[in-house]
Amino acid sequence: MKTWYMVVVIGFLATLAQTSLALKEEDCEVCVKTVRRFADSLDESTKKDYKQIETAFKKFCKTQKNKEHRFCYYLGGLEESATGILNELSKPLSWSMPAEKVCEKLKKKDAQVCDLRYEKQIDLNSVDLKKLKVRDLKKILNDWDESCDGCLEKGDFIKRIEELKPKYSRSEL
């Protein structure tokens, strides 16, 4: 009887440890969001065949930019990709495995997949520009494809952002 009790307790603890170790979306955000978005774009007939999923993923990757493009590179979804672990994505998706689990499998093959992070967006309506670093101010201008010729000090960058703010900020009503 004691042995049976110990087996049940150990089984419970193993299950508890497994759920706490499961990959969360914020641990691998680019992978989870990209896989989820890609899986949602597939039609039912494509979802059943892993070869069609691979072809669709390569087509999907041609339209991706920034972090998603890098994710595609790591998986082998681009022509210039050095390695290919595309079957680690396509086969689990054909089994209707959730994005978190797919990314968990991908992370075991290539940890770089989960090193990708989205950059935090700065809300210009609520942030105090004077408290930002010059690097962040330059990033705001760069994201807008604007430059600040002759800007040397933080105040110059702030002045330029304030000039361009009405053009680029989306104020919600």
Swiss-Prot record:
Pfam families: ARMET_C (PF10208), ARMET_N (PF20145). It comes from the Eukaryota. Its main location: secreted. Residues 1-22 form the signal peptide. PANTHER family: ARMET-LIKE PROTEIN, MESENCEPHALIC ASTROCYTE-DERIVED NEUROTROPHIC FACTOR HOMOLOG. This is Mesencephalic astrocyte-derived neurotrophic factor homolog. The gene is Manf. GO terms for biological process: dopamine metabolic process; dopaminergic neuron differentiation; neuron cellular homeostasis; neuron projection development; synaptic transmission, dopaminergic.
